[in-house]
A protein has these predicted regions:
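Non-heme Fe(II)/2-oxoglutarate
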Residues: 51-146
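Charged, low-complexity, helix/coiled-coil-prone segments
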Residues: 25-40, 64-85, 115-124, 151-160, ...
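Catalytic core of non-heme Fe(II) oxygenases with the double-stranded beta-helix
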Residues: 141-244
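Short low-complexity stretches enriched in small and charged residues
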Residues: 32-39, 45-46, 71, 106-112, ...
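Contiguous hydrophobic segments
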Residues: 17-26, 38-42, 46-48, 99, ...
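Fe(II)/2-oxoglutarate
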Residues: 1-75
Length: 244
């Protein structure tokens, strides 16, 4: 039986808008408008931005597209500032008081030491789930025409030279929409290689700034984490699905 983690700081597990990155927070009302329009119109197209300068401005101000020479919002792989650095520090303090374990049910090639919050700290899991629903769900509607209603896992993961000597291509079988948040950036190596669908060329998503998140369709996008050669790469990973 897993003993639940006792929080070092109670407010770390209270969902509040002040935990979001300031660059993102002010644009969420616009993204909610866009998500509603995407639902009503069965998806948005570039032409929808022409009559809504604020829509285009918000997307370009917040979302970085990877695998495209200029912003088209079609590659399916994006990054954006999600959580503010001060809150990341609170999360790292909690991590320091917990223990990482590998998931024996995963393929040995992709096993990474992790802390699954549903098992180890349900209150923190629920807080982060609320922040995901508030900030990321509208982006999923805009960028993928999808609604990730169900959270399959929220976990801290740690990549080190000992456990990532080489990467392995894989899909996130239990995640339609995957979000990976950088908790640290003082290691050497890391980043993520991505193979887009169809005949697209492989590209790299570099190590992101602390608090920034990579967003992609985990179950449909081949990817692997590049080796960490020095230090530890700490991540916060969300796996969400359209169905239970």
């Amino acid at each position: 039986m897993t003993i639940s983690h006792v929080l070092l700081k109670a407010s770390t597990a209270i969902p509040s808008k002040d935990k979001l990155h300031p660059v993102l927070k002010d644009h969420i009302p616009i993204f909610e408008q866009m998500a509603k329009a995407a639902e009503d119109r069965h998806g948005l197209v570039t032409a929808d931005l022409f009559g809504h300068e604020d829509w285009a401005d918000s997307l370009c101000d917040v979302i970085e597209e990877h695998g495209a020479s200029h912003p088209q919002f079609t590659s399916g792989v994006y990054s954006f500032p999600f959580l503010k650095p001060e809150y990341i520090n609170d999360l790292l303090n909690e991590i320091s008081a917990m223990s990482f374990e590998v998931n024996p049910e995963e393929d040995a090639l992709v096993q990474i030491p992790e802390i699954t919050l549903a098992d180890n700290c349900r209150t923190l899991h629920d807080c982060l789930h609320s922040l995901f629903q508030y900030a990321v769900k509208p982006l999923a509607a805009i960028l993928y025409n999808l609604e990730p209603k169900f959270m399959q896992s929220i976990q801290f993961a740690q990549y080190t030279p000992e456990n990532t000597a080489e990467g392995h291509w894989h899909h996130d079988e239990d995640s339609d929409i995957t979000l990976v948040v950088a908790l640290t950036n003082n290691h050497v190596g890391g980043g993520t290689m991505v193979k887009p669908q169809g005949l697209g060329e492989v590209f790299m998503v570099p190590q992101l700034p602390v608090g920034h998140a990579m967003l992609f369709q985990g179950s449909r996008t081949l990817h692997y984490g590049l080796p960490v050669t020095e230090g530890a790469r700490n991540l916060l990973v969300f796996w969400s699905t359209l169905r239970p």
